[in-house]
């Protein structure tokens, strides 16, 4: 499901705001500080109960108010979502007047945020890339979520035993790690394999419009499992026991996985400009979004904040043609609306909002 209308009350800088969202592409533009990012943030909060800007939801409450409220509608299903956050109280989430958890919300109204952290995906720590990978699988597969929780529950218990120096007690949790961890690795490897295919298809489309897009076709993208693939997870755990005991933590396993982006054996983060890294990160996130629709029949909202930052005009032109190939709901922001002559889209499917005129 996806929102067709969203209403905000006392959210960030907005006292009251109602927006009817296109089923395809939506552009919010205006000068810095006008509230563009806050609108995207409100949609993200409405889809997962969290912000992509802060872990403190109380900071989203408008100054002078005691709470914020988000109400969203899905015209296709008739569903109504209500989110309330009052100071010093937990967030309250209802779908069709029934209380739901954050996990249930994320599966009902899935979304992906491409924000300042995602822009420089390759500059971030492996933990960030794992979370980005896991988020999509979490939304799509209850089986994956079950194995994820099972693995990390066993990992926590194993590490607790290692801290006491009891290797025999630690080994008691190896079976849980092996069973759940092997499945996690399978899901992740399959995702990366299929997303790579989609990514390369997108690059081929861009190459038809701009030769500079060839830069993105020669990239090697591989997942590192976090353990010795030739030995397997079971044998890797056995061989690392002495080191685990010495360090008092489990050093190998899917919790150490990473996705590596390279070109000619050099890390992308070391050779790509910031603008090139940003386009790569957007294309990879978009490919993952398409993967979820293709293999799991879910259509996450795709949120992209501040499109043109860090991009020169040539790199921006390199990316823009892909917008008309995005079938899911795409919501993005930019300082100015400079796309009239650059995006050939049906006006009924592409809506523009001048944020300064909305307030």
Name each model feature, range by range.
Residues 79, 120-209, 224:
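An accessory alpha-helical subdomain
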Residues 47-128, 137-140, 144, 196, ...:
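Nucleotide-state sensing region of NTPase/ATPase domains
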Residues 44:
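Helix-to-loop junction immediately C-terminal to a conserved catalytic motif
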Residues 305-307:
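Walker B catalytic acidic pair
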Residues 72, 327-335:
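Structural recognition of the conserved hydrophobic beta-strand(s) that form the central parallel beta-sheet
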Residues 1-31, 168-301, 310, 314, ...:
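Conserved NTPase motor "head" modules and their coupling/switch loops across ABC/AAA+ ATPases, GTPases
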């Amino acid at each position: 499901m996806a929102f067709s209308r969203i209403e905000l009350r006392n959210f960030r800088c907005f006292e009251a705001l109602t927006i009817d969202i296109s089923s395809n592409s939506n552009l919010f533009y205006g000068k810095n500080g006008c509230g563009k990012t806050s609108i995207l943030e409100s949609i993200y909060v409405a889809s997962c109960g969290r912000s992509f800007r802060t872990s403190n939801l109380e900071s989203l409450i408008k100054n002078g108010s005691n709470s914020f409220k988000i109400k969203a509608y899905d015209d296709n299903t008739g569903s109504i979502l209500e989110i309330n956050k009052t100071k010093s109280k937990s967030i309250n989430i209802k779908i069709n007047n029934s209380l739901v958890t954050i996990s249930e919300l994320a599966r009902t109204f899935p979304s992906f945020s491409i924000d300042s952290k995602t822009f420089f995906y390759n500059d971030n720590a492996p933990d960030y890339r794992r979370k980005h990978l896991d988020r999509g699988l979490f939304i799509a597969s209850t089986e994956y979520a079950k194995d994820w929780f099972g693995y990390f529950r066993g990992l926590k218990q194993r590490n607790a035993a290692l801290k006491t120096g009891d290797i025999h007690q630690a080994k008691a949790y190896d079976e849980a790690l092996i069973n759940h961890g092997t499945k996690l690795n399978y899901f992740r490897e399959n995702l990366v394999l299929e997303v790579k295919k989609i990514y390369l298809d997108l690059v081929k489309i861009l190459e038809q419009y701009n030769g500079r897009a060839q830069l993105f076709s020669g990239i090697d993208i591989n997942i590192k499992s976090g353990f010795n693939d030739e030995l397997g997870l079971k044998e890797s755990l056995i061989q690392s026991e002495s080191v685990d005991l010495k360090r008092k933590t489990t050093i190998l396993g899917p919790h150490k996985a990473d996705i590596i982006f390279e070109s000619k054996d050099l890390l992308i983060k070391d050779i790509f400009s910031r603008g090139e890294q940003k386009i790569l990160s957007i294309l990879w996130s978009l490919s993952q979004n398409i993967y979820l629709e293709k293999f799991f029949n879910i259509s996450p909202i795709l949120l992209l904040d501040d499109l043109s930052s860090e991009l020169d005009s040539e790199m921006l032109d390199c990316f823009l043609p892909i917008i008309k190939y995005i079938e899911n709901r795409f919501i993005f922001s930019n300082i100015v609306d400079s796309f009239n002559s650059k995006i050939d889209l049906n006006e009924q499917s592409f809506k523009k909002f001048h944020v300064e005129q909305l307030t």
